[in-house]
């Protein structure tokens, strides 16, 4: 099987954000307000057909035409100019032409333009009008490779391209660029999943198609919310031997039926950063034991957090809290398992954000955890155990609702200061904590019942929407 040693790098909607951020930066350096920005798209006409290849003799093919009535049969020859779709080298060779045109437009016209295969994205000042696209079109006419007039999208405050709607209308006022996924893409994914559910059959090929479509959709959602829920598709693609619609797939479908119609737009901050100050520091920990009580194992867990909130010109504010989970509460994870520490660590890491949503809203956070399993699940957005995956879904859903940017980091257990609040019933634990942090005060605590953490998908998702309000910052309306 032939392969190539070259590859290409495609742009995303982030190109528009990069240009917008540069406009903001240079306007600020000049002491001016940011001017309005506009975005437009163009497309090459019959792209693969207009770019020649070095072996045109191989683009001729022959089929046998059967005799019909009095018309004689015989060979019929067809010539396909340019590049053939499906050939490994065709993409690489074709891509050289639009790359060349982008380089020409940038160097001769100072035009902020880039390309995604045969699609061009132009991001320019509103005061420039259509001049950027006119210049790009002129260069293509010089190269005898015209742009497609039917696919031309004039410079505007919002346009559809690369599978999403890119809105730059708030760049100069609020320093924000908004990206929304097209609804028909969401509807297609839901339709395919419902068909598989009704047939109780999801083969690996279909799972791969759905997974690819979901990846594209979620790339334009805040924090790629919902990524965790798509992991049953990966399991089906590579490991499952039974192709029935499993409980994990049912849970995934319920999640996306609630999420996709309410999919949060991606808001990219391109102005002077709201997050210029230091981040909030979070430590969470959990302890778990199953002592014998009257000859019966009684499981119990204690969750703890330690939060450092920076204050400009003042010492940071320190908050701590703990909450106890008895055997009855832990039955939401398992009724028999004697080791539930990973589940409790994930619960602790999510509980801190449920407890103080207004404190964390729109903040950068550095979150320290000493359990590598919980850390991996929260970082990568998936856990193989269903109850862990549900909590990870809940965390990422909450992070999107609060517009959080969380950086997870491992910390050795002996250095995790949340270890003491998570062992608050033990003698001397809190005395040692207050000796280290005399200014720390109790923080809020709210832990939803573990059994309600997305057990049925849509119902509890809507409860999260209701509790935490709009998906997006209140200062900008994207409806």
Task: Show which residues each predicted segment covers.
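Catalytic palm active-site di-aspartate
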Residues: 1, 41-45, 84-86, 108-127, ...
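Catalytic-core region of right-hand nucleic acid polymerases
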Residues: 1-92, 179, 183-234
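Catalytic palm subdomain of template-directed nucleic-acid polymerases
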Residues: 2-6, 50-53, 111-145, 165-174, ...
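A short, polar/acidic, helix/strand-boundary loop motif
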Residues: 72-100, 308-347, 373, 382
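Active-site palm subdomain of RNA-directed nucleic acid polymerases
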Residues: 91-139, 352-369
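RNase H catalytic domain
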Residues: 114, 124, 354-418, 423
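C-terminal reverse transcriptase regions that engage the nucleic-acid substrate
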Residues: 156-272, 419
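RNase H-like nuclease fold core
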Residues: 274-341, 355
């Amino acid at each position: 099987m032939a392969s190539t040693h070259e590859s290409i790098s495609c742009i995303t909607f982030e190109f528009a954000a990069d240009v917008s951020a540069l406009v903001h930066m240079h306007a600020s350096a000049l002491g001016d307000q940011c001017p309005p920005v506009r975005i437009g798209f163009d497309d090459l006409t019959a792209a693969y057909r207009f770019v020649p290849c070095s072996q045109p003799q191989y683009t001729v093919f022959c089929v046998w035409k059967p005799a019909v009535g009095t018309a004689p049969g015989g060979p019929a020859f067809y010539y396909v100019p340019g590049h053939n779709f499906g050939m490994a080298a065709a993409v690489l060779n074709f891509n050289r032409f639009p790359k060349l045109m982008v380089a020409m437009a940038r160097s001769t016209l100072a035009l902020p333009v880039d390309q995604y295969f045969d699609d061009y994205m132009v991001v320019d000042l509103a005061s420039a009008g259509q001049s950027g696209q006119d210049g790009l079109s002129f260069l293509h006419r010089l190269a005898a490779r015209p742009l497609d007039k039917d696919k031309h999208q004039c410079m505007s405050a919002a346009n559809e391209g690369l599978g999403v709607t890119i809105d730059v209308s708030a760049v100069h006022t609020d320093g924000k660029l908004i990206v929304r996924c097209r609804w028909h893409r969401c509807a297609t994914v839901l339709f395919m999943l419902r068909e598989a559910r009704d047939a109780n059959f999801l083969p690996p090929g279909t799972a791969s198609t759905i997974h690819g479509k979901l990846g594209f959709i979620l790339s334009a959602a805040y924090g790629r919310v919902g990524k965790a829920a798509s992991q049953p598709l990966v399991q089906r693609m590579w490991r499952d031997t039974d192709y029935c619609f499993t409980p994990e797939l049912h849970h995934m479908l319920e999640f996306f039926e609630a999420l996709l119609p309410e999919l949060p737009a991606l808001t990219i901050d391109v102005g002077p950063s709201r997050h210029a100050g230091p981040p909030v520091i979070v430590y969470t920990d959990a302890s778990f034991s199953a002592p014998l009580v009257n000859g019966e194992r009684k499981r119990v867990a204690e969750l703890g957090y330690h939060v450092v909130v920076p204050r400009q010109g003042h010492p940071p504010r320190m908050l701590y809290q703990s909450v106890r989970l008895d055997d009855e509460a832990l039955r939401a994870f398992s009724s028999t398992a004697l080791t539930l520490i990973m589940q409790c660590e994930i619960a602790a890491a999510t509980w801190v954000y449920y407890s103080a949503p207004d404190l964390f809203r729109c903040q950068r956070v550095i979150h320290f955890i000493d359990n590598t399993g919980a850390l991996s699940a929260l970082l990568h957005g998936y856990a193989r155990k269903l109850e862990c995956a549900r909590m990870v879904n809940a965390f990422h859903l909450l992070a999107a609702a609060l517009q959080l940017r969380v950086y997870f980091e491992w910390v050795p257990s002996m250095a995790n200061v949340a270890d003491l609040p998570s062992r608050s019933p033990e003698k001397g634990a809190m005395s040692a904590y207050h000796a280290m942090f005399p200014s720390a005060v109790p923080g809020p605590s709210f832990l939803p019942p573990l059994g309600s953490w997305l057990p049925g998908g849509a119902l509890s998702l809507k409860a999260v929407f209701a509790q935490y309000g709009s998906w997006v910052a209140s200062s900008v309306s994207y409806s």
